[in-house]
A protein has these predicted regions:
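Amphipathic alpha-helical dimerization/coiled-coil segments
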Residues: 1-6, 24, 79-108
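N-terminal helix-turn-helix DNA-binding core of bacterial DNA-binding proteins
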Residues: 2-45, 68-83
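Beta-hairpin "wing" of winged helix-turn-helix
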Residues: 55-66, 70-72
């Protein structure tokens, strides 16, 4: 999978408020799938679909503990998205700085 495809998967996964809430919960520590599903007014099957999307984007990792599935957040994928956003932000700041400089020169 290309870096662009990986980033697309990460950003698409982050676009959904339920998936963001799951990641926020996992920021407090590992959790069982059933525990993650509890606060949502949707079926366990729907929560499982959201979790699979997060897994495909490498935002969460699953491991088995007996019969239970335990999830943890993968900060590496979040860091990749943050790095891309920071690069984009730096480019826009540079463009805005050049525009401000050009406007200042016109006023002088």
């Amino acid at each position: 999978m290309s870096d662009a495809s990986k980033l697309d998967n990460i950003l698409a996964a982050l676009a959904d408020p339920t998936r963001r809430a799951i990641l926020l919960r996992l920021s407090r520590g590992d959790a069982r799938v059933t525990d993650l599903a509890a606060p949502f007014a949707i079926s366990l099957n729907s929560v499982s679909k959201h979790i699979r999307i997060l897994e495909r984007a490498r935002l969460v990792e699953r491991r088995r503990r007996g019969r239970e599935h335990v999830l943890s957040r993968n900060n590496h994928a979040l860091n990749e998205a943050a790095a891309w956003i920071e690069t984009l932000q730096a480019k826009w700041h540079s463009r805005i700085d050049r525009l401000e400089k050009a406007l200042d020169e016109e006023e002088s």
